[in-house]
C-alpha cells in the first residue's frame, strides 16, 4: 500500500496568486496542489491536499488523519502558526510526523511571525523557498 501524505493549507492560502505576490509568489493554490499531485504520482505515494480558513476545521482534519491512514502531514498553518495552541495540540495528539512549510522566510518578516507554535514538535521546518518548499517537504516525507 502506498504511503499516504496529507497537505494542509491554512487561512488565506486560497488567495495565493493574487495576495501579495511579491511575498508569496504568483502561483495559485490550485497550481501548487496540481504540481504536488503530479510529483506524488511520480514518487508512488497517495496525496490529499486540503485548505481551510477556520482553525477548528483544520483541527478536525488533523484528528481525522489519525483514523484515515495518513502517514505524514505537510502543513502550512499560515497565520495560525503564530497563534494556535489548538493546532499544536492536535498535531501532538495524533502523533503523525509532520513538516511545517512557509512560502516566505518568516525571519525576514514582522517580528510577530518569528515564533511558531509548531516548529519544536515538527520533524522539520521549510521557510522561504516559495512553492518549492512543498516539493522539498513531499520528497522528504516519502523517505521518512
UniProtKB/Swiss-Prot annotation:
Per UniProt, which keywords does this protein have? Amino-acid biosynthesis, Aromatic amino acid biosynthesis, Lyase
Annotated Gene Ontology MF terms?
3-dehydroquinate dehydratase activity
Q: Which family does it belong to?
A: Belongs to the type-II 3-dehydroquinase family.
**Positions bound to substrate:** 76, 82, 89, 103-104, 113
Q: What does the record give as the reaction this protein catalyses?
A: 3-dehydroquinate = 3-dehydroshikimate + H2O
Q: What is this protein called?
A: 3-dehydroquinate dehydratase
Q: List the disulfide bonds.
A: none
Gene encoding this chain?
aroQ
Q: Which PROSITE patterns does this chain map to?
A: DEHYDROQUINASE_II
Top-level taxonomic group? Bacteria
Q: Signal sequence: where?
A: none
